[in-house]
């Protein structure tokens, strides 16, 4: 064994061994308990960033630990390879998205291998290959036949100059990112999957997910947004149709003083034909973004349509306004407004001078003061005719019943959740497998024409999708009749909704899934990824699993038992102000800093001498130029060091502050372990451990070893507090470094301890542990070694520490047998010189003894 720790030599050698031995390839084995450990698959952007490294290190630690417990562990990896960034990069680099993507995959695959992640590479998938997306296309056609897929018009961002649809992120301040033309909202036909048909089950089954973070479950509950209310029908004077609104507060119905409809509602459109102000407003709304965050903060505007609706219970006429806070996509595109008891309605009514009628009493039974704001709390009704005096529930039921009796109201359960629009007017995605015949009939692509292959050898102009630009591509025939293919592609969330299941059978050619393999491995035991995926990906992931279950492919109801959301990786951020007042962000690697005595940064400059402004720690990002390249760190310190720092610096679900001093600390620790093993093995063969022959000190050290094994096992396995597990191993290492190494049993004990330490560190630092295990004479590869088991006998305390006080002041501590009597403890205390001097020439008047803990001698 060489004296110096040289990661660059060890790591490549061990990685080659894993590759040649195919160490992490697994197959179904009914005789073993399975464990499926999955990290969210990466987008092949070109380089790994520290967020990836953190995510995949956590996954690898869990997978290696479970493997050492003797389980059959599947840990696969693949590439979420379709998506918009590839189109932008292709235009910029004058290439096509496919070669750019495949080059990135090759580069990043090598980076993953360099970090020593134990993946089953035989199961690698790239979602942009026809071998993968053909099954997604087939499944979509089956969902269509089941009535779970439909087409309807929906609003998109449209650039009139480029004549193209833009993704939300391509709209900058309301303008096209390429040509700066003002973006319009345009209605185009798009494909949808009926996720709403599963809303109740998606909501209900959240209760089964005991090992998912509550924050994620709450976000999904709110996103699905189940509510119980009443759908009410209003007649409108001079308008051919009725208006239907939904409310969760029918108790406030007698306070409804106006209705509001979306600018896109047929009533508003009709009224706008003879109303220039309204027509201009409808036009303005058409080009407004409808992201929910913006809806909440934007100014509420409206125009009176001139129509009057009839209140179904009072017969009063109430105005109908067009308002920008009502969306056609949500509900019926019309809402009833009760300004006395809803803050948004109150602000709108105050702005436009509409009637505000209170119908709920304040908590103290008085009429509410509505001079400043609405009263939104529930309470007792007044000003409501026959319903006066009723509290919320009674009023809800009485008014709902009355409306139903008159045929103008119906109790309804509503959801905020909207059906999933899966059409994208982009090129780099899986083609949607639908065709339109000459007579307008829409059909799913026949099975013998699947997969519909996306051509990869294309020229990108950055404006129009190559498959839309090439009229020949869309031409096909069905039953000998000409037809046109759909030129939209799938939302890339489609691919990431079922990849986890395909990993169980990536070579299977008979269908989407091999049920036998899928049901052996599924559900996923732990799924690791960022909380930013809480509603979109993680909801579609759950939805797709239920679709596959209902198609008879899987038997479980949910795709993953446990979800672990890792925290973000933060780094210092610095900038200097340029000549034009712009901020120039400087990489923390290039910042020369001065710190105060507490280690805080007080001054910074860069190599060019610019005074830098330090903005604190923030998420590593391109925009702040504060990303640290994992590759540079691996080259400098080795993969094991980077992995150890990642797992030690912070709990897995909390933010991690990147500090190179911490990386250096992790590196020093690995060197200490190496040095101790080197010194130990250099002394030659070791005798067998004879537990019965150990001295008290040796027993105490062995107790520490086995208590550490018990703690680390609990920290990694049950608590998943990986940082405290590492801290416990470090603490034990400090004791081992100080332990005597001369006697035969000293060395035998150190041998047992080091073999335990190396196995406990193996999930975190697998390369160095692989090597040290061999040096310590471990059996076989450490990858197949069992996890150390704590010896219960060794952990039994046969002595205990008793604090000795004289007149209530601590004067010493003594070690006594666990079963020592009070007399024996007193006798032992008298022999302790620190205590004895306080007992010299005095009389012990009283003895207070707390067995095994405290002896207090009262003297006078």
Curated annotation (Swiss-Prot):
Transmembrane segments: none annotated. SUPFAM superfamilies: Anticodon-binding domain of a subclass of class I aminoacyl-tRNA synthetases (SSF47323), Nucleotidylyl transferase (SSF52374), ValRS/IleRS/LeuRS editing domain (SSF50677). GO terms for molecular function: aminoacyl-tRNA deacylase activity; ATP binding; leucine-tRNA ligase activity. It catalyses: tRNA(Leu) + L-leucine + ATP = L-leucyl-tRNA(Leu) + AMP + diphosphate. Signal peptide: none annotated. NCBIfam families: leuS_bact. Belongs to the class-I aminoacyl-tRNA synthetase family. This is Leucine--tRNA ligase. It comes from Salmonella paratyphi A (strain AKU_12601). The lineage of its organism: Bacteria, Pseudomonadati, Pseudomonadota, Gammaproteobacteria, Enterobacterales.
